[in-house]
Amino acid sequence: MTLPNWLRPGQLFANLNARFHALPPAVRKGLVTGTHWGLCVIAPLLLFAAFFDINVVNPTRVGWLLDEDWGQHVLGWNAWRHMPWSTFNHETLLGAPVGNTLFSTDSNPLFAFLFKPFRDFLPANFQYNGLWFLFCVVMHFTFAYKLIRPHAPGKWTAIGGAIALSALPMLYYRMRHDTLVAQWLILWGLHLFINVRDDTLPEGSGLRFVLSWFGNGQKMLGYCALLFVTGMIHPYLLFMIAAIWGGDCIKRFFGAMRIVERRLVADWKVMVDAVIRAMPPLALAIVALYIGGSFTKGMSPGAGGYGYYSFPMDGWFNPVKPEFSAILKAWPLDGGQSFEGYQYLGFGLILLVIAAIVLYITTPEAKTARSFIARLRPLTAPFIILFLIAVSNHAQFYGYDVWKFQLPDALRQPAAVLRASGRLTWPITYLLIVTALVVLFRSRPKAIAVLLPLVLVVQAYDIAGMSRAMRKATSLASSDQMYYQTPSPEWDQLVTLSKGVDFYPANVHMNDKLFYELTWRATSQAKPVNTMYAARENLIQVANQEAGMDAFKRGEIKSDHLFVFLKQCDAPSELWPRLRMLDGVWIIPPKGSTVDLQKPEWSPLRSEVRFGWLDQGTCLLDENWSRPEYDGVWSEGPKANLRIPIRHVEFDAPSPKKLEMTLKAKSRQPVLVTVLVNGVKVGEMNLTPRATLNTLPLPASALRGETLRIRFLVEEQIDEDVIVAPVTPVKLSGRGAAEREAAAKVTVPVDARALGIKLINIKLAPPEAPAPKTVLKS
């Protein structure tokens, strides 16, 4: 079959081109301009639709957000929305009575302050997270275009460059932490550094001098706006922007120095002006942090994990997950690196960078980009610092250690402030792509019209699976269902009848979806809850939570509060008659409640009980235990108890007649531990700092009772008075943390945990059963 001439591509293009040029010049210009700006509008909308379910922009769809980190962020907004303005940036509903600031729940102070004035006009269920995502994608494309347009051969290639800068997978991968999708702030900073004219000295005197100072300070004013807005969004982004701004300060300050006849000559007027112009942006950044709530009494400045959430040296070309690249093979990373350190460029942009490097080395035309690269030199020192902090003290390349060392004690606390250090290479990543685009623009200004679309096609093909995964993450927004774990209407009645909601254990992560759904109801009625997952925990609130859990173990709860179990937990005998169950959740209704509810039923318990911070074993602990760690829990002294509802344990062998108890435990120093079960001594354990398995027989009566009461007594090996607490500085947390922090400044002869044990897991099994496998490494 032969195509007619008018349908052949060459002829078709020639005909269209001839007809276009036959139009009046004004019409041609209007069509070109309209098409250009139309594409500028459509491109970010298509990018948004590629990575998000478009229903997220419906502000009344809240159910999709009540999960993982999103739940923390939207609850912070909902609680603050229902507080009076007198609390400013603070609310006392989440983690009552101490509460949280907008920053401690990562609730986007910028949008929170924007929407709160209209709270009486907003729907009862309202979220701005979806609108924020759309806003960020549009702003990202806008600043990408502003950044690249002065260096592109034409406005069409500038659009291609803006799409390339907006097609980085790491931008959309951070949707779980919505404020970190504001990576357009980095592009804004690079635009100010690269494209905006440097400030100059003011002229004249008096009012003319002042007006000239502001008129000649466009870059300073730009940084004032940028640092303030960034400070209202997220401190990590502010740290990155500060590196770009710091590079500009370095350029202007040291640019005033030059060598004349082997002597260093400095223009002190320029240097003084540079210092003075640095003050307003810095001051506004501090003000923004204050408004958002970064400076709060009791808030821990940092958290553990520096070195775990680092940037892997293969991050730019490792997709991490098989579905995240259709071309390159993924290499699994440590849990923290695979999230915070994820910065895969996409195969299309990898080709872009490689092509730019090859052209820069081999072609003279690319050397014209040297002037552009030379202007970036002041960023060298700040970006090296960012890179080293991001890589951390544990650098890896495809899972192999490049270096690994212990941080000096003096650096541990400062490093904890930036524990999610893998993010800090974002400015470097964006500058890498910008530089590659400029090199290609300068070396192949005509061919780029073909090369850049090819790069974008390859990029789209490579990350299509990643795009689908991101859309799936927001797919619940397509439903108007609000509650998934707590659908019964009785929950609304119970919350209305109560003066607050208390959760046990006070650990949101044990069942975050249950917590978020009930807490949304509570905060919507301005009812306080006893706990909250915060970006930086408040040590005073932690002490309150621990005291509240100890009170529950003694049978003391607030009778006018709704008491909710995040996992099924044993309760003191005096509270059992009040226990009820709704939607499979164990609760104690508030006093005076007439809601008809069924009594609780135990789901079978595993015969192997673990005591990590997310394990059900933490529900079985009595008093004298510290906050659980990821793999176990320390007793707070030489005596500690726990209770196992033995009647509801599902054993590997049906109806066993006898049982043995195998414990995995360790201690801080060699100790002898006596173990009692239901008041009867069943054996002893010799524990050391190395975790060991210890098997003890249980009395026949253990299977006849309702509860297995286990008691540990540590036999001290040496006199208490000579046991000295470790001198290594540690981050204080747990029961009485705020008080212990103050007491730590005084010499304390005994560390309670030094006399305790760490319980990792317990296995109950018949004697003839094979020995249990070790479940955790020591």
Regions found by a protein language model. Give the residues of each.
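Start-transfer (signal-anchor) and selected internal transmembrane alpha helices
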Residues: 1-57, 269, 273-280, 365-382
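Membrane-interface helix-loop junctions at the exits of transmembrane helices
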Residues: 49-54, 159-163, 167-176, 287-298, ...
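Perimembrane helix-loop-helix junctions
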Residues: 239-282, 356-367
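Periplasmic/ER-lumenal interhelical loops and adjacent helix-loop junctions
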Residues: 67, 284-360
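Membrane-embedded helix bundles of polyisoprenyl
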Residues: 134, 138-147, 155-199, 207-252, ...
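Membrane-interface coil-to-helix junctions
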Residues: 45-139, 168, 177, 182, ...
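C-terminal luminal/periplasmic domains and tails of membrane-associated envelope-modifying transferases
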Residues: 493, 530, 534-778
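Signature aromatic-anchored transmembrane alpha helix within multi-pass, membrane-resident enzymes
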Residues: 246, 279, 384, 434, ...
